[in-house]
């Protein structure tokens, strides 16, 4: 899952003291998120269930963030009764559903394709603001929407009878819609009467997701034996990677660290600048999956991917 499909809600950019530093931080975050897809796909290909990996990611990230917030901002540990419903929506539909559906999609689609579909979430948000909230929309947003739609059709090779796996495509669409709820509920939280900083908001979102998974898949039934093996990654030679090490990457370097870097970068960048750097994630993810997993795009699909990213970028910069 990515958290960079659009600039993080509630993170107001401070005066830009160092734009290069901001770009570097956001690029590192995008790269870590990009590698996370390949690592997660490898873990799932070696016996760890999609839902259980989602449970491990949410629970592990919650524990790490809880320890951090307890050290630096103990007041943020307090949850007021009025914010519980919104935090529940944010955590269950925004966090848990986005992660699980993205993981499901990459078990059946190329990682780059899944991310391209998920990255169209800002366009759906723009449609919601236009038709749901009746906000005016610039013509460039409609051009961007048309470009992204055409690009997705090219990536799916619809003229050849739609070559993408139907379940994988449906899961990616579901992840995209869940990501829309993630951004809208987060935005409502940080602008409403119970405002939170982005770190504690993410912590409680992960906490709500972890609680959801604990009820849906109780820990006492966890198949711990699936974490005891090793996994071979095609592009790393004959190295056998311990599954717990790869899961640790998904939790720490694939979730907590890149999110923190993204938050720090927003102290130096405007949202429009950050959105440009965020567009590198599917590009980097596709390159990593090509090298490590052998996933490839045809030249026509690459052209479609460029059209999708161009459309998203055009719409983002004209919202």
PLM segments and residue spans:
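Hydrophobic/aromatic residues within transmembrane alpha-helices
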Residues: 43, 53, 57, 105, ...
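Glycine-/small-residue-enriched transmembrane alpha-helix faces in small-molecule transporters
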Residues: 2-56, 161-191, 209-215
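Membrane-interface helix-cap regions at the ends of transmembrane helices
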Residues: 61-80, 94, 147-163, 207-243, ...
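Hydrophobic transmembrane alpha-helices of multi-pass small-molecule transport proteins
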Residues: 2-5, 65, 69, 128, ...
């Amino acid at each position: 899952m990515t958290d960079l499909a659009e600039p993080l809600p509630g993170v107001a950019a401070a005066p830009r003291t160092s734009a290069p530093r901001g770009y570097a931080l956001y690029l590192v975050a995008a790269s870590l998120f990009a590698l996370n897809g390949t690592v997660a796909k490898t873990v799932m290909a070696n016996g760890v269930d999609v839902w259980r990996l989602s449970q491990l990611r949410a629970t592990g990230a919650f524990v790490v963030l809880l320890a951090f917030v307890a050290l630096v901002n103990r007041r943020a540990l307090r949850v007021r009764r009025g914010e519980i419903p919104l935090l529940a929506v944010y955590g269950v539909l925004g966090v848990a559903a986005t992660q699980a559906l993205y993981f499901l999609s990459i078990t059946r689609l190329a990682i780059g394709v899944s991310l391209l579909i998920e990255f169209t979430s800002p366009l759906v948000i723009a449609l919601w603001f236009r038709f749901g909230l009746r906000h005016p929309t610039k013509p460039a947003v409609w051009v961007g929407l048309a470009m992204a739609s055409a690009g997705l059709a090219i990536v799916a090779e619809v003229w050849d009878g739609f070559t993408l796996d139907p379940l994988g495509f449906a899961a990616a669409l579901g992840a995209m819609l869940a990501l829309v709820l993630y951004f809208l509920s987060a935005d409502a939280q940080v602008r409403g009467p119970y405002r939170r900083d982005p770190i504690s908001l993410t912590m409680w979102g992960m906490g709500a997701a972890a609680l959801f998974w604990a009820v849906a898949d109780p820990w006492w039934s966890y198949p711990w034996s699936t974490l005891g093996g090793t996994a071979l990654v095609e592009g790393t030679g004959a190295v056998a990677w311990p599954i717990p090490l790869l899961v640790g990457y998904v939790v720490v370097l694939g979730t907590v660290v890149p999110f923190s870097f993204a938050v720090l970068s927003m102290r130096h960048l405007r949202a429009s600048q950050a959105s440009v750097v965020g567009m590198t994630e599917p590009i980097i993810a596709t390159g990593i999956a090509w090298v490590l997993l052998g996933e490839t795009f045809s030249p026509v699909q690459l052209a479609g991917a460029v059209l999708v990213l161009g459309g998203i970028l055009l719409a983002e910069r004209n919202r």
